[in-house]
Amino acid sequence: MYAIIETGGKQFRVEEGSKIFVEKLASEAGSEIVIDKVLMLGGGDVKVGAPYVENAKVTAEVVEHGRGEKVVIFKKWRRNDSRKKQGHRQDFTALKIKAITA
């Protein structure tokens, strides 16, 4: 069985035992969270929500918090001897999916 969930403004396809990286959540590492924004349940019997599937939830464990790879933003204006370099690292939370209940 799999589910499509929504968290942090993004959608993820998850199965039991899978590990996903989502936008940073305000939960301690090792704690358990429940995601009730389930857009679709798949497997044998497919259920599509409008917008969410009723009484469906996904239980996940917070594995760790971290920061992603550095993205370099470089802007250069020709003939002006002007340039700007900036870096960004996005915070993330790693989740391990424990259970999908409908």
From Swiss-Prot:
> Please, one GO biological process term?
translation
Gene Ontology molecular-function annotations: rRNA binding; structural constituent of ribosome
Q: Please provide the record's keywords in A-Z order.
A: Ribonucleoprotein, Ribosomal protein, RNA-binding, rRNA-binding
Is Ribonucleoprotein among this UniProt entry's keywords?
yes
Q: Does the keyword Ribosomal protein apply?
A: yes
Pull one GO CC term from this UniProt entry: cytoplasm
Assembly, in brief, is: Part of the 50S ribosomal subunit. Contacts protein L20.
What is the stated purpose of this protein? Answer: This protein binds to 23S rRNA in the presence of protein L20.
Protein family membership: Belongs to the bacterial ribosomal protein bL21 family.
Protein name (database record): Large ribosomal subunit protein bL21
Gene behind this protein: rplU
